[in-house]
């Protein structure tokens, strides 16, 4: 539980760093389309980092099995969804966009798993 909160807080801090990097450093170097893609990565990164903090908090009230798989799926989603968008923009490797939906599916699966686990209690 505590580890999920720590990971979520660390990833939230990293999302702020990436957001500032996008606003201050990349703003004049990227096309408006690429900047929007980068900002989408930052936005979903932050949403799901906050989700990890929430799940860690829920872990203090429920059995840790309730949050384990959902939290893993959100973490994987941040790495694949946001990570692929960051790499797509920063390296120009457009093929990274093909793996972005895998991260999106991981986000969806994480939230659905949380629903199912909480309902089963």
Segments predicted by a language model, with ranges:
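Polytopic transmembrane helical bundles with strong interfacial aromatic enrichment
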Residues: 1-121
